Amino acid sequence: DTLLVVCTDHGYLLGEKGWWAKVVTPWYNELVHTPLFVHDPRRPDRAGTRDAALVQTIDLAPTLLDFFGAELPPDMQGRPLSETADAQHPRESALFGMFGGHVNITDGRYVYMRACHDDTNQPLYEHTLMPTRIRGRFTPEELTGLTLAEPFPFTKGVPTLRIPAHP
């Protein structure tokens, strides 16, 4: 009667493709194709099966809410893995990457990878709900170009601060 989910957040390069670690590397398959094991006691017919469906970590919270019978918020972007197991193509593509690094989109077979910054893709902005970073605040100089931006689907209708990025 226990749902068991085992996953990782990303891989780690140990010299593959000439890269070490993970901070500024392109998001190669070794980093993003990570293990996910799910045992759902409601689905004994799926025990021991392997699925090639395109899923992401955004599907984990909806999976837990679904298992416990809780309602999914209307703005939640992930989908319960119980639905994914029955769908042939639960999603057409997945977007992944990180601010300051490569941004990618995949259909599960091919990946389009784009570097974050060059002279042709300006302007670049940071979006935040509060003007702080992990280790400190934005400087007054960085905040001079701040504007309010339209909300994203995941900000629950709250506008974000749009701050010009300084790569």
For each of these PLM feature ranges, what is it?
Residues 2, 48-107:
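Polar, surface-exposed loop/tail segments
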Residues 2-47, 56, 91-92:
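Histidine-centered active-site microenvironments of extracellular/periplasmic hydrolases
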Residues 14-15, 85, 114:
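Activation segment
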Residues 28-29, 99-167:
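C-terminal, low-complexity/hydrophilic appendages and adjacent surface loops
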Residues 32, 59, 111:
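Active-site phosphate/pyrophosphate-handling residues
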